Amino acid sequence: MSQWTPEYNELYTLKVDMKSEIPSDAPKTQESLKGILLHPEPIGAAKSFPAGVEMINSKVGNEFSHLCDDSQKQEKEMNGNQQEQEKSLVVRKKRKSQQAGPSYVQNCVKENQGILGLRQHLGTPSDEDNDSSFSDCLSSPSSSLHFGDSDTVTSDEDKEVSVRHSQTILNAKSRSHSARSHKWPRTETESVSGLLMKRPCLHGSSLRRLPCRKRFVKNNSSQRTQKQKERILMQRKKREVLARRKYALLPSSSSSSENDLSSESSSSSSTEGEEDLFVSASENHQNNPAVPSGSIDEDVVVIEASSTPQVTANEEINVTSTDSEVEIVTVGESYRSRSTLGHSRSHWSQGSSSHASRPQEPRNRSRISTVIQPLRQNAAEVVDLTVDEDEPTVVPTTSARMESQATSASINNSNPSTSEQASDTASAVTSSQPSTVSETSATLTSNSTTGTSIGDDSRRTTSSAVTETGPPAMPRLPSCCPQHSPCGGSSQNHHALGHPHTSCFQQHGHHFQHHHHHHHTPHPAVPVSPSFSDPACPVERPPQVQAPCGANSSSGTSYHEQQALPVDLSNSGIRSHGSGSFHGASAFDPCCPVSSSRAAIFGHQAAAAAPSQPLSSIDGYGSSMVAQPQPQPPPQPSLSSCRHYMPPPYASLTRPLHHQASACPHSHGNPPPQTQPPPQVDYVIPHPVHAFHSQISSHATSHPVAPPPPTHLASTAAPIPQHLPPTHQPISHHIPATAPPAQRLHPHEVMQRMEVQRRRMMQHPTRAHERPPPHPHRMHPNYGHGHHIHVPQTMSSHPRQAPERSAWELGIEAGVTAATYTPGALHPHLAHYHAPPRLHHLQLGALPLMVPDMAGYPHIRYISSGLDGTSFRGPFRGNFEELIHLEERLGNVNRGASQGTIERCTYPHKYKKVTTDWFSQRKLHCKQDGEEGTEEDTEEKCTICLSILEEGEDVRRLPCMHLFHQVCVDQWLITNKKCPICRVDIEAQLPSES
C-alpha cells in the first residue's frame, strides 16, 4: 500500500466513506459519487442505464458492498474520481454501516435509482461519469448488504446508470459488509471499483484482487479526467508492480473475500489492508461488458460500458472485496472502450493486472453476466465482484489469451501480479497459482482487448497452459477451504479450471461478451445466496459450494469471499463467474475432482456448484461456478466436489447443485437438457463438461437470451456444441488431468452404485445363506456338490431377479468397475445358475466388495474366489468332501452296533423279578433297621424310558449288567454301542463276559 500515492489514499478514504452506511443517503451518495465520477469523461453519458440497470446497480451495490472494502485500493486507482468519489465515499461509509442484507439491497435499489437519477442529472458524457455512476451505484447499493439486494432497475439505461451508481453504492455497502466480515483497513483510498472488489459477492474478482489490493493502482483511473488519464498511465505502471504484488497478494485478496467465510482461510484476509481493488476493477470490467438488461442479482453490479477507450487499464472498475465487502469502483473507460464487445472486459483485462489475472475479454461479458445477469444491455457494464481478476483460475484462462493477444500492459501488470501472486500462493488459491494467474491474467486481458475469439483460442491454449499453472492455485484453495484441499489438484485445477474455463472462456470468451447474459439474472432471486451467483439456483450453490467458489475464484479471493460471504460470494462465485470465478469454481470445487482438474468448465460442472456454476463457468462465470460449488468442500469434490462427481460432499451436493445451477442461472443460454443431463454426466466428466461447456458457450453466444433461470438452459444449445468441442478439447486435456477427479468421482459413483448393488445382493444372498440350506448341506454327504449348486442358487436366486440384475448390470454398464462383466465371464459351473448379475459382479470386481460380507459363508467365499472354476472345486469342494468323509468315518466308529452284534454281545430275556428273595431279605433287614422298604425299592427301571420293568417284558442286559427294555436299548445301541449308563462298549465286555 505504500506504493499508493496520496491520491490513492484519498480514494481509499473515499472508499471508506462510501463504505459508510448510507441507507437513505444513497441518492446523496450517488450524487457525491457522481460528482467524483463526473470528473471523468462521460461514461455515463456514453452508456445510460435504464431503470432496470439502476435496480441492478442497487443490487450490485448491495452485493458488492463487501467488495467495497477491497475496492478502496481500486478507488486509489480512481484518483481521477477522487474528488467526486470522496463525496461518494462518504455516502458509501454510511451505506456500509447500513449494509444489512436484502433489505439494504432494496434500499440500494431505491438509492441506485436515485443514483441513477443523479447520474442521469450528472450524466456527463464523460466515461468518468459512468464511473461516477458506478461509484454512486456502489454508494447507493452499498446501503444494501448484498450487491444484488437492491431492486433491479428496469430500463437498460437506468440499469447502466443505476448500475454505476448502484455499484458504487453497493460497493460502499458491500464494502461495509466486507469490512464487517473482514475489517480490512480502509485508510487508503479505494476506488469505487475497489469497493466493489471488497464485496465477497465479487468473490472471484475480489478474491483475485484482494490478494493484490496493492494493485489497486491499476484500477485507479476510474474517472476519465485528463488528470486521471495521466494517473492511469502512471497507475498502469504501478499496476504492473501492483499486479505482481497483487498476484503475490492475490491469495490474500481472495482470502479477504473469503475473510467473510474464514479469515484464517487464507492470507488474503490479511490483505484486507491491501484491498484488492485491482481484482475489483478487473472483475468489474469483466462484469461490465455486455450487461444484459434484466433484474440484477444482489451481487450484480452494472457499470456502464463506455465505448470510449479513454480509460486505460487503470480505469477499470475497481472492485475489491477485502472484508467480504464489495466495493465497485467506476469501470475504467479504457477497459470498456477496449473491450471489443463494448464490454469493459477486454479493457479491464488490459487495464489492470488484476484484470489480466482475471481473463476479462470474453469473460468480461460473463463477468457482467455475473454481476448483472439481468442487465443484458451491453451499454451497462456489470462489475462482477465475485470474480477476482487475480483469480488464478481466471488467470489461467487469460494466460492463453494473453499469449494470443499478449497485451503488454496487461501482461506486464499480470506478470508483476504473478510475482506477487506467487508470494501469496499460500494465502489463497490464487496465491497458489499466482504466477500462472498473473500470466494468464495478462493474457486474458490482452485477449479481452484483442477480441473474444482470440481470447477463446488463447483460452483454449490457456486451458492447457493454465492447467499446469493451475496447481499453484490449489494452495490458495486449500487455504480458503480444506474442502478444496482434496482438490489440491483441483485447486491447481483452478488453473485447470481456468483452463477448462479457459476453454469455456474460449467458448464463452467470445460469447461471454454476449454471454454476459447474466445467466445470473435469476441470481438476483438469491441475493443472499452465499456466493451463489445464481439466485435461481441458490440452493444449488450451498455454502459448501461457496467455499468451493472461493477456490473457484481463480484468485482464491473469490473463493474465500464466497466462503466468507455467501451472499457476497454469490457474485463472486456466480456473478463473477467471470473467467476467474468460473475457473475458481471449477478448480476449487472440492467436489469436482474434475473441476479441480481443469475440467474447469467440466470441473465445475462436475464440481460443487458445478451444475449452476459449470454453466456459469462455461458462460464465463468462473466465479459463478465456483460460488455454486460448494461441494467445495469436501470436498468434496469441488467441483467435484466434486461437483460432477460431487458425490463427494460437495460432489454429491454439488452435482445436483451444479446441474441445477447450470439449469438455473448459468444455463440461461444453454439448452436445459444439457444442464439436466450433466447430473449424471457430471461424473462423466467429458460429456457433462461438454454439455456444460456447450451450455456456457451457448450462454456466451446467446447471453442476450438471458432467459429466466429456467430458460437460461435452453438459450443456446447449438452454439454450445460448437464451443463444446473446443471447450471440450481443452477440457479433454484437462480432463486427463481432471480424469483422476473425473474418474475419481466417476469411480465414486461407480463404487457407490456397486456398493448399493452389492448390499442388495448381499442382503438377499446373505439371507439366503442365513436361511442356510447351504450349511445344512454340510451334513449331507454330497455337501460339496450340493453346496456348489446351492450357493449359485442362493447367489443367483436374487441375481436372477430382473430388477436387481438390471440395476446391478446397469450400474456396471454405467461405468461400474464391474462393467467388464459379461455372462460369458461366469464360471461354467455358475453360468447355468443365472448368477450372472451377482456372481458376475463378484467375479468382476464387485466380488472383492462382496467377499467381506460373504466371509461368513465359506461356500460363497470359495465360489467367489474360484469363479474361474479352478479354486472352486479344489479348495472349497475338496475340503468339504474330506470333512464329510471324516464325519462319515467318525460316524461309523460311533454309529453303534449292528443288530447281530447287539444280539451277540447282550443278553436278551424276559424280565422276571428274580430278586424277590433278595428283596424280601433286604426288606427284612431294613425292617430290622427300622426302615421300611417298599416294593419300589425292589423294582428296576429302564433308564432309557424310565419305566419300571414289568414281569415278562423283553429286556436286554448289557455286558455291564445294566438292564433295559430291548426296544429301548436296541435303538440306542444302533446309534451307539456303548451302555447309556456307564458308557462301556458292549463289545469290550464280551471277552470278559464270555
UniProtKB/Swiss-Prot annotation:
Residues 241-404 are annotated as: Interaction with AXIN1. It catalyses: S-ubiquitinyl-[E2 ubiquitin-conjugating enzyme]-L-cysteine + [acceptor protein]-L-lysine = [E2 ubiquitin-conjugating enzyme]-L-cysteine + N(6)-ubiquitinyl-[acceptor protein]-L-lysine. Keywords: Cytoplasm, Developmental protein, DNA damage, DNA repair, Isopeptide bond, Metal-binding, Nucleus, Transferase, Ubl conjugation, Ubl conjugation pathway, Zinc, Zinc-finger. Residues 66-89 have a biased composition (Basic and acidic residues). Its main location: nucleus. A motif (SUMO interaction motif 1 (SIM)) lies at residues 300-304. Zn(2+) binds at C942, C945, H965, C968. Changing D384A: Abolishes SUMO binding. One of its GO terms (biological process) is protein ubiquitination. Its EC number is 2.3.2.27. Residues 907-909, 957-961 are annotated as: Ubiquitin binding. Residues 174-184, 234-247, 508-522 have a biased composition (Basic residues). There is a cross-link at K19, K28, K34, K47, K59, K73, K87, K96, K110, K173, K198, K218, K923, K927 (Glycyl lysine isopeptide (Lys-Gly) (interchain with G-Cter in SUMO2)). It is found in: Nucleus; Cytoplasm; Nucleus, PML body. Changing L385I: Loss of affinity to SUMO1 and SUMO2. Residues 164-173, 395-467 have a biased composition (Polar residues). InterPro entries: RNF111_N, Znf_RING, Znf_RING/FYVE/PHD, ZNRF3_Arkadia_E3_ligases. One of its GO terms (cellular component) is PML body. Binds free ubiquitin non-covalently via its RING-type zinc finger. Ubiquitin-binding leads to enhance the E3 ubiquitin-protein ligase activity by stabilizing the ubiquitin-conjugating enzyme E2 (donor ubiquitin) in the 'closed' conformation and activating ubiquitin transfer. Pathway: Protein modification; protein ubiquitination. E3 ubiquitin-protein ligase. Required for mesoderm patterning during embryonic development. Acts as an enhancer of the transcriptional responses of the SMAD2/SMAD3 effectors, which are activated downstream of BMP. Acts by mediating ubiquitination and degradation of SMAD inhibitors such as SMAD7, inducing their proteasomal degradation and thereby enhancing the transcriptional activity of TGF-beta and BMP. This is E3 ubiquitin-protein ligase Arkadia.
